[in-house]
């Protein structure tokens, strides 16, 4: 299974070619795709991929592996949100995926042991490793006109106690102190929850002072100096806020929740507390512009 991002297309293609050279009968599934049309396009443009999956993949991927292992590939159309090949033709699911994994389930906790065993085997220094965590999925706002990040994803939050336990356990188990969050908005329109989450991160950092949060994304609306200071104390070094434009008029037109003033104040407080603001993109040439 290959998680497909824009920056990984070439790497995924090369990996797929090598796998097919070694084992032509191997089934390669590509995921992390936003729409049905994009999934079809991947199969049209990359011959080494056999199946493309769009939207959330945990449950469909489980059903897919069951069908393949039981040699029931003629039943693939019953699995939601996949495109696949049959006799040179690209077909798609008859049904949408309606099954979404419980983010707080321990069954979803990743095990990176084999990855770090390989790092040790090849002598790769652990300082280059970065652990990824998820405290929620999709976005509570879902209104920004240009955003494609949440297509096929259902918004829901993870129990913060589960996330904090996962972080503490992973840091202890793997000895990795650089982490990042994959959430589109760590605050999730719930400042009390975010405050409690920061408290938990600070407790972990007391035990592991080297803990560094190298990426986290938030919506700047409603964030004040106290919150930014607490983020710094919790270990945040880099944050993304979805800046997009210095024009309030344009931000309103594209339905951003951020405002020029909320972005400016966050950048001011972040500078004060030594948090780097990453990915402060300025969008140009929008239809609304």
What are the functions of these language-model segments?
Residues 1, 34-36, 58-60, 97-100, ...:
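Short, solvent-exposed loop/turn segments at secondary-structure junctions
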Residues 1-97:
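Glycine-rich beta-alpha loop elements in corrinoid/cobalamin-binding modules
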Residues 30, 215, 279-281:
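Structural beta-sheet core signal
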Residues 39-45, 226-228, 286-289:
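Catalytic cores of alpha/beta
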Residues 96-114:
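Conserved ATP/PPi-binding loop(s) of AMP-dependent carboxylate-activating enzymes
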Residues 108-276:
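Radical SAM [4Fe-4S] cluster-binding motif and immediate context
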Residues 251, 281-282:
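Short beta-alpha connecting loops at secondary-structure transitions
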């Amino acid at each position: 299974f290959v998680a497909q991002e824009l920056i990984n297309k070439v790497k995924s293609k090369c990996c797929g070619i090598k796998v097919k050279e070694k084992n032509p009968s191997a089934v390669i599934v590509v995921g992390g795709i936003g729409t049905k049309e994009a999934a079809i396009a991947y199969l049209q443009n990359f011959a080494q991929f056999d199946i493309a999956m769009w939207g959330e993949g945990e449950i469909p991927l489980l059903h897919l592996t069951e069908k393949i292992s039981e040699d029931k590939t003629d039943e693939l159309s019953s699995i939601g949100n996949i495109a696949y090949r049959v006799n040179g033709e690209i077909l798609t699911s008859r049904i949408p995926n309606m099954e979404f994994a419980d983010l707080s389930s321990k069954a979803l906790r990743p095990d990176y042991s084999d990855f770090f065993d390989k790092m040790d085997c090849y002598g790769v220094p652990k300082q280059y490793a970065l652990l990824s965590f998820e405290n929620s999925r999709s976005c509570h706002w879902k209104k920004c006109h240009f955003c494609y990040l949440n297509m096929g994803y259902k918004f829901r939050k993870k129990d913060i106690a589960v996330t904090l336990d996962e972080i503490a356990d992973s840091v202890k188990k793997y000895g990795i102190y650089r982490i990042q969050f994959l959430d589109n908005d760590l605050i999730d329109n719930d400042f009390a929850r975010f405050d409690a989450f920061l408290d938990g991160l600070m407790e972990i950092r007391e035990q592991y002072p080297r803990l560094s949060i190298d990426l986290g994304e938030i919506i700047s609306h409603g964030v004040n100096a106290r919150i930014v200071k607490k983020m710094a104390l919790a270990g945040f070094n880099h944050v993304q806020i979805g800046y997009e434009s210095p024009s309030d008029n344009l931000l309103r037109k594209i339905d951003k929740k951020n405002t020029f003033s909320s972005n400016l104040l966050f950048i001011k407080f972040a500078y004060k507390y030594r948090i780097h603001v990453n990915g402060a993109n300025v969008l140009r040439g929008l239809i609304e512009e």
